[in-house]
């Protein structure tokens, strides 16, 4: 059973979150950027062992639109995460971020390391660090040269959209690249995406954001145990790009999920949930 709850964040904006599952809490922040949290589902069945607290970022899903559009920015979303932790009454928490919210969670970790027990970054954007996410992209694409859709999808991945309608067309053409297998589950997830995005939240996420040159050093000193999950076939970030992050985060462990893309819990739910649960349940080193 899933319930929706609400709280007032640091600036008074009412934010919504979903609670589902059983077990210790795992706070989950969605990516997009600007995408409602519904796309995370139950993270491949992770709700069987964890109580998932799934945040709808401001202006998305069931959360309210903020009065100030500048608060859509990635570092302000990190402030929302801290407000949610305080609202939940958690002294420390386990935190999971996917895609764009990987950046949110890295900023949060740098600002509030004492509030984290464990951190899970799934296919995180590296933009807040000023690092490339498309390292060896040509090699990743070449590995999928046998797919019937590869030429059209690869062209759409880097094409410039003429307007909003064209953007959606290109998004759907490129969608197979985001999954390990372009099957019914992948198609259903991709088809649901357009309705889940809030344009203002997407546009505002990186607006006027400049990476802090001190952030890599602060994260390198982070002692919080961190799991990095990369999809073997992901194009953004590639598994090669994720090795940069693993080298930076000295307390991290990188796992590359075989046959997975940008949404590893869709490609192989059992493998994803088992990997994350094993990490969260492990005894402290």
Predicted regions and their residues:
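Conserved HGGG/HGGXW glycine-rich cap/lid loop of the alpha/beta-hydrolase fold
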Residues: 6-70, 84
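Conserved alpha/beta-hydrolase "acid-adjacent" motif
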Residues: 235-241
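Flexible "cap/lid" loop of the alpha/beta hydrolase fold
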Residues: 119-158
